[in-house]
Amino acid sequence: VTNQFQCERLIQAGRSVADISKTDLIVLNVQSNEYPANPDAIQYLFNIASQNSAMMNVMYAEDIFKTIVQYIRENKTAYVVTGIPQTKNSVLHQIWNKFAHVTFFVVDEKGTLHEVTDKSIYQKSVVHS
């Protein structure tokens, strides 16, 4: 979750995926060591996760990409729900292409869930349905 204060739609969509797939819902927040932590944002994220029966992990890392990749690998993650990449250079594209066995979903601004089927072109402008 990139912006903790706009995460509710992502977590709710994740709850739907977890319910359908009969898997656990885990909210992962990876923050850069370069920026100070925002306790209000973390508390808000925790509250939304709790309301949706999700476990929450907050991690601090110098290399966010590497940390997320390692987390997905170590936890044998089957489904990942994120927001829509804002640019074609987004770290999300790199993560999507790293894992053939993981099903990725994005959630648009309206809260609609979309499966990522073409990992090379999916950008914000593509998801206006």
For the regions a protein language model found, what residue spans apply to each?
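Small/aliphatic-rich secondary-structure junction motif
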Residues: 1-52, 57
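Structural beta-alpha unit
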Residues: 52-79, 86-88
